Amino acid sequence: MTEALGRSFASLSIPNFRRYFTGQLVSLSGNWMQMIAEMWLVLSLTGSGVAVGATTALQFLPMLVFGAWGGLIADRVPKRRLLLLTQTLHMIAPLTMLALALQGVLAPWMLFSLVFMRGCVNSVDYPTRQAFVMEMVGSERVVNAVSLNSVLVHGARVIGPAFAGVLIATVGVEPCFALNAASFAFMIWVLAGMDTELLRPAEMATREPGAVRAGLRYVRRTPELWIPLGLMAIVGTLGYNFQAVLPLLADFTFHGGPSTYAALVASMGVGAIIGALINGARSTVTPMLLVGAAIVFGILSLVAAGAPTLALEIVALAPLGAATVTLAASVNSSLQLASEPSMRGRVMALYSIVFLGSTPIGGPLSGWLSQAVDPRAALVMAGIAAIVGGLLARIAFDRVAQIPPDAKLEPA
């Protein structure tokens, strides 16, 4: 038991990663507070599930459009220096929202514009953060570090909504914006204080025409990359839309307020933390783990869709959260391990595109389905998509296993 726990937290023995872990927990908690405030504010101002879905879409549309170039920037610029810039730019949106909200003039179109701007910064920031993990811990601990990264992401999903639910219900949305801006300032301090001598910087990509296309060709000829990416594209588009579905589930299905929404998000977060800690004890990722995680995620989505009461929904979302993080962390780790260092930024940008950038398609679809039918219908869609995606990935892995080792399989 003690040995397993030690393996789960092994990467925290590295000073830079330990410092980064702390900074990200604070920063991501602030980010979740802001996202909860944004979603509830849009729902309060418009009463529209489509508007909530559109807000989610605007946040991630830049990743879909610009993500590949964001990954190229991550391959060409020292990652710590680039993160210092993106964290500074990330402070602009919450400070602007705070000023507008305090003046009582924050309209939906203003919020949409600022959410889109934050998404543009994130199209560079997200793939850079993913690739930077390898530079802090090395290949021997990247699976553990990615899992611990998932722990802090979903720990923030518990902490942020819990604080946001209390603040919105008692004071309003303004403190959420202020605390998020402060959290980015803390992350800047964390990055600036790292011991650069302990980092393992990847080889910088050469500046040549067609570098983005070269990254796409590299993924296309590498089954260990395109199969997990294809699986995540399916599940990411149709399944990972909880930012749009959960506020509608809280409001339309269970007739609750911000505290109900926060409870649903926190339940998924608790389950995700447990799942990430279990996943962190592994040192490798197998194809069957990817397939199994997708199918289990699909089954648990269908279970959550059938929960008849709020209490049972909260219970059902916890194991769904564990399955969510197991699939995402397993795909992330497998891509990091299979990528060449000079291509890692572009590969992780493609992961970012299918994981987050697919939301502009899935977010509005889930929002529309939730409003036109029921939020449970969006969970049914997620479940079916994940099961189908897992089965397709199994078929693809079986085909690859039949190819001689010196041959390459490219998708048709």
Model segments located where?
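Alpha-helical transmembrane-bundle signature of multi-pass membrane transport and export proteins
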Residues: M1-A412
